[in-house]
């Protein structure tokens, strides 16, 4: 009996083993592997294989476990699949809703060191980091489907990062942390729906499983990665503030490395992609490595390039604490939407810079070369507008000119000045390197004359004999030379056309503008070197200078006055002003009359008065309608006297209103005129031949302006130094020997053009 029972048990075990052997041969595995499997592994692999039939009913062949005739095309397909797995640089895996690995390719051993047989049929939770269990559960969970029940199958995209166990040697494992390696998994969750026979509009769905591809992230050591022409790397702190950038970033994005250092990566990323970048940054801090989605990196000259980054946290070798972030970035496209500016960094970077600074004693050859180089560099770096320009506007006017309720003041235009060819330059003796923005106000500029009602209506006037041509030249000096062939169209840009540093042009310059030339003779022909505003990034605003001009000194000019000298000069002038004020307060009105040669009377500012039509040179003027008349005007020695006093309320427009309605900032173009006054020597010891016989007028609108901005040059708040009363008193005390140029700005509608304009009027008076 015992022998029979032993034989029966042996036979049963042999039959069982043969069945397991036959079952193992049915598995899609090499015979070398299946022959060494134990029974538990065969059962585990078989159940996993059966589950795969639910996911892929048509599976790996015509019928599971049945051999069939194979065609040459099928053999090619199998070989192609094998090669794809080898070149994938990753592994494919299928996970059931309960976390069981139904299938994983044999290439997993290359990245993890774990065999295919060991992983198949086991739970994936045994091979991932404990902190990633919740994330894996969320990935495998299917929510209520939003698709119609008539759709039988659909996929839900999944992309996530897992820290999987890695048993490779350190030299082959790459970057690991605690025996885990970051794997980027991307794939889809497959959902199948079924409809009920009794209720065709109701149904149920089945979560079939997750099909994904796992990729190993590149190692952190940059020396192990060959940087191609479309790649650059950067090193950043843990908050993504850039510390170091590869030089290739200049070729790919336009930014130099020093332009991006100490700035965060978020400042140079498209606003729609910052959320994805933030998520990637969070994953990087948690898991140590991450691959970002495709995002748009803003280029320097407008537009963007599509980039994908592989970032890694580098730990300190001594303390094993996170030290910094190293990222390898792949630039996938060329610059798209060139000229479209989405960042202030792009706006400031895309503006052409006009530099006029040179050495203290430049030669004529250097000046000529500098002018040519400025012209060529400016043409090559012309600014491109981020918004479409409409043909209905003037070709040189920005879009903000039309939209601004201030009528697009020429002091607040946003576009950069454009360069003229030498043939189109306004004058031969002036090197007007910048062409001024043409403004649609057909009223031009007027310099230092009295007006009657008839001239105010006719939009032009005649120069009297007392109106000297030099004053118009002085106005053209500060406001720019009118462009020839454009009639009353004036370039109202607050740029300073510089003269060429040659003796011939200097003599012509002094002969044409003797009053300004006299000022330069007193001060050694030195120009002010403050930056002037030509454009503004904000529509209708006069702030934030874009194109900057720095003037040059003439060849024979001495050193420019320093800030200390200017401060001493201004302090001395303040003392003189106070002394004159005290004397004028004590002196009666007849003494004032004896000092100035005439009694102090109120004359008119843009008022009606009767005067025979004078003869002289025709000068187009502003149509100053609806101006309030004053009482009378006083004449002295056949010359018109401008008013001594103008209240702030009587001025046409305060300078502070030149800026946009949403801004309280003063136009820097007006500030230039004030700074030119501050630089001028206002001592009464000049010769009479260096100044005109009639001193210019100081308008009351400058009182608030000087109160606010007198400190810009000296550093002290000289509150009462440059108000209209003080300047008038000083002018009387100096017997009219002082020359000053101030801007008087007036907002005036132009019905012919359909929007408002701004004209700048320079007047001269006692």
Swiss-Prot record:
Residues 373-385 have a biased composition (Low complexity). Residues 353-365 have a biased composition (Polar residues). It comes from the Eukaryota. The keyword Nucleus applies. GO terms for cellular component: chromatin; nucleus. InterPro entries: bHLH_dom, HLH_DNA-bd_sf, PAC, PAS, PAS-like_dom_sf, PAS_fold, PAS_fold_3, SIM_C. CDD domains: bHLH-PAS_SIM1 (cd19738), PAS (cd00130). GO terms for biological process: cell differentiation; nervous system development; regulation of transcription by RNA polymerase II; ureteric bud development. A motif (Nuclear localization signal) lies at residues 368-387. It is found in: Nucleus. Residues 336-766 form the Single-minded C-terminal domain. Gene3D superfamilies: Helix-loop-helix DNA-binding domain, PAS domain. Transcriptional factor that may have pleiotropic effects during embryogenesis and in the adult. Efficient DNA binding requires dimerization with another bHLH protein. Heterodimer; forms a heterodimer with ARNT, ARNT2. This is Single-minded homolog 1. The lineage of its organism: Eukaryota, Metazoa, Chordata, Craniata, Vertebrata. The gene is SIM1.
